[in-house]
Amino acid sequence: MAEQNETSEIDLLYEGNDKLEKIFGEDFVDENQDNIELYINGEKNELTSEYELKKGINNIKLVIKNKLENLSFMFDESKTLKNIDGLKYLNTENCESFESLFNGCSSLTDIKALENWNVSNVTNFRGMFQGCSSLSEIESLQNWDVKNGEDFSFMFQGCKSLTNINGLKNWNVSKGEGFDSMFEGCELLSDIRALEFWDVSNGNNFESMFLECSSLSDIKPLERWNVANGNNFMGMFSKCSSLSDITPLEYWNVSNGDGFTFMFSECSSLTNIKKLQKWNVQNGQGFEDMFADCSLLKDSEINELFEKWKI
């Protein structure tokens, strides 16, 4: 790997169309006015969030004078960002937040440049790849040290081309508290074995974590998850239309859960919920539409479960 210096030169490629394009997030620009010089196709420009890019490929060079401590919103809604190879030279060792770093980068397909990033001090990964709708695999993240991560919410929300999450297999998420909407809308994701040994014991918010994962049919990898600290399970598996068997959740400790609204709503393949009878939901307050539009379930089955739960 090339040596990372105090001053970094980062080359990026954007695909322009002779119109005003957003290439950086406003918050990132405001915070780095004095730290970054910008060159577009070789010409120095003022650092702002929008530019009129010529039709075709445009070269954007960033000259970063000092180590960045906050990459939040750096490429927020940069829909024409095509190539980030230059980011492999970016020194991230001081960074604590990657919130919405690539949010809405819908043309981004390759994140190999990030594989050697030092993320050991990052606590906030919220929405980092949200809306990266062309991203199909994240193997490049397999060696990331995310042990200090606390917020993983919305991290891959809307990554509708994502089919392979093996890069997350060895992640240490033991400090993670927020996992809400982490994979929401990953409609092609069918294999979540990479999550089998995740330590989510510190997690309290699982709302909509797998919402609209319409290809997900096997949740056995979640069988041994310790969700005892979880209080919000609202919509966690809502619209998982291929999910027929929730037996793996039989021994989940949800005794601290207070929100179960829409948890399995529109799971149109779901046929059996008897295994949930062992759940302790004594602290639950919201159960509205928990199984709404589960067309293969009978009302009598749902009523029987609720009677067992005494709600």
Name each region found by the language model.
Residues 1-311:
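Negatively charged
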